[in-house]
């Protein structure tokens, strides 16, 4: 989803380093340990990033002045090659809520370690994940297991969208909890992908 971009004036030290060309890759940004506070950092270093809206919900709240309605959106971003982000946004306008969610997803960007962790495969290419990982959000628990090449993404529609944007092609997924709650289903998948970086082994990318 494209939006009109204004000229970027960096407000953080990390942003100024990226704008000045002192940092030239998203890997350097993530390795620095500094939080990404400006989405333009991601726009500049990952120009091929895609986004997908996973859910739009209307949220109502009673106030002294009456009933207030906002839209809550859930968005995932990724470049289909090892980087993915998850975010949500709220606003009285759907378009603004989506844009806020996209910004938050970029600020929450992570690198996913990919590999061939299936004993049935052993091709040593980055088509799956290197290890079994689990993520939780609310009542939802998602476990991702390495799958051999050609199996595809054996999971529900929501995790499949997250995994595709992360660049994962083959995986087995097992779920528990209220998976009808899109926000928790997507976040649990994202949290599982975070865990791929906890163990560094050979044959990962």
Swiss-Prot record:
Coiled-coil region list: none
Disulfide pairings: none
This protein's GO CC annotations: cytosolic small ribosomal subunit
One Pfam family named in its UniProt record: Ribosomal_S5
Keywords: Ribonucleoprotein, Ribosomal protein, RNA-binding, rRNA-binding
S5 DRBM domain segment(s): 49-112
One biological process term in Gene Ontology: translation
UniProt superkingdom: Archaea
InterPro entries for this protein: Ribosomal_Su5_D2-typ_SF (IPR020568), Ribosomal_uS5 (IPR000851), Ribosomal_uS5_arc (IPR047866), Ribosomal_uS5_C (IPR005324), Ribosomal_uS5_euk/arc (IPR005711), Ribosomal_uS5_N (IPR013810), Ribosomal_uS5_N_CS (IPR018192), Ribsml_uS5_D2-typ_fold_subgr (IPR014721)
GO molecular function, one term: structural constituent of ribosome
Domain notes: The N-terminal domain interacts with the head of the 30S subunit; the C-terminal domain interacts with the body and contacts protein S4. The interaction surface between S4 and S5 is involved in control of translational fidelity.
Family of this protein: Belongs to the universal ribosomal protein uS5 family.
Listed HAMAP family: Ribosomal_uS5_A
Subunit structure: Part of the 30S ribosomal subunit. Contacts protein S4.
Function: With S4 and S12 plays an important role in translational accuracy.
UniProt name for this protein: Small ribosomal subunit protein uS5
